[in-house]
């Protein structure tokens, strides 16, 4: 049966919020963030109207779209797809046979959308773009998660994301079994080589960071990248630091 659109949207927004809630500094409304993304993406694609569909399809005409996967994958973006459909037309009914994070074999039907053909075609491209990209990220993430399973390590994401699509790409990493790192420049301190060079010294960078956080009464994670074990040993006893990233350049760990 079709899902109640308004009820589903609230639940889906909560699920999306769980992905990044620990990385949003200052109580950012994640649900509004996702809704805003959908609104802007739809306007980018539709503008003032889908002129081809408006010109060729009766607005009362209804139909059904069936979605298949072209490759084996970890499916991702189903919750987002339902939110997109709801925002385009609350009367669209969505029926999906899988949930985000499930493995799907090639050529499998994952679900259908029923309702106004004009509405289906307006939502189709954004829906497919998001699901294809998110599923690719989730699948690749899942591959590496299984690859490192014997070791006590985790796969983290980065800020190297598609502009204005970060929340969905990090969502996909989470779906694939990875761990979300900082969402932006505001929710964690990450002292890297550029900061160290500008400060003149790794200890100076850390001390300046400590002074700044105290002056602003900020309690957020502090991470520092070190390029060798010598740098690591110099700063390992700083209580301010919560995590170390050991980046060894041009050397083999094993």
Model-derived features: positions:
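Low-complexity basic/metal-binding stretches
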Residues: 237-254
């Amino acid at each position: 049966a079709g899902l109640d659109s308004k009820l589903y949207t609230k639940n889906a927004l909560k699920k999306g919020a769980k992905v990044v809630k620990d990385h949003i500094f200052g109580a950012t409304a994640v649900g509004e963030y996702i809704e805003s993304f959908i609104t802007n993406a739809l306007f980018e694609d539709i503008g003032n109207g889908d002129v081809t569909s408006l010109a060729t399809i009766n607005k009362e005409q209804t139909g059904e779209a069936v979605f298949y996967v072209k490759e084996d994958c970890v499916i991702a973006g189903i919750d987002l797809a339902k939110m997109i459909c709801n925002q385009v037309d609350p009367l669209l009914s969505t029926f999906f046979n899988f949930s985000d994070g499930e493995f799907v074999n090639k050529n499998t039907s994952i679900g259908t959308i029923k309702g106004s053909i004009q509405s289906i075609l307006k939502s189709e491209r954004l829906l497919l773009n998001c699901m294809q990209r998110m599923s690719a990220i989730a699948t690749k993430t899942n591959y590496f998660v299984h690859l490192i399973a014997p070791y006590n390590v985790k796969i983290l994401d980065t800020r190297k994301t598609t502009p204005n699509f970060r929340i969905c790409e990090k969502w996909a990493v989470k779906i694939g079994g990875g761990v979300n790192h900082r969402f932006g420049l505001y929710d964690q301190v990450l002292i890297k080589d550029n900061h160290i060079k500008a400060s003149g010294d790794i200890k100076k960078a850390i001390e300046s960071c400590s002074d700044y956080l105290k002056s602003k009464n900020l309690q957020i994670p502090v991470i520092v990248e070190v390029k060798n074990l010598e740098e690591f040993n110099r700063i390992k006893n700083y209580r301010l630091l919560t995590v170390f990233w050991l980046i060894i350049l041009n050397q083999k760990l094993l």
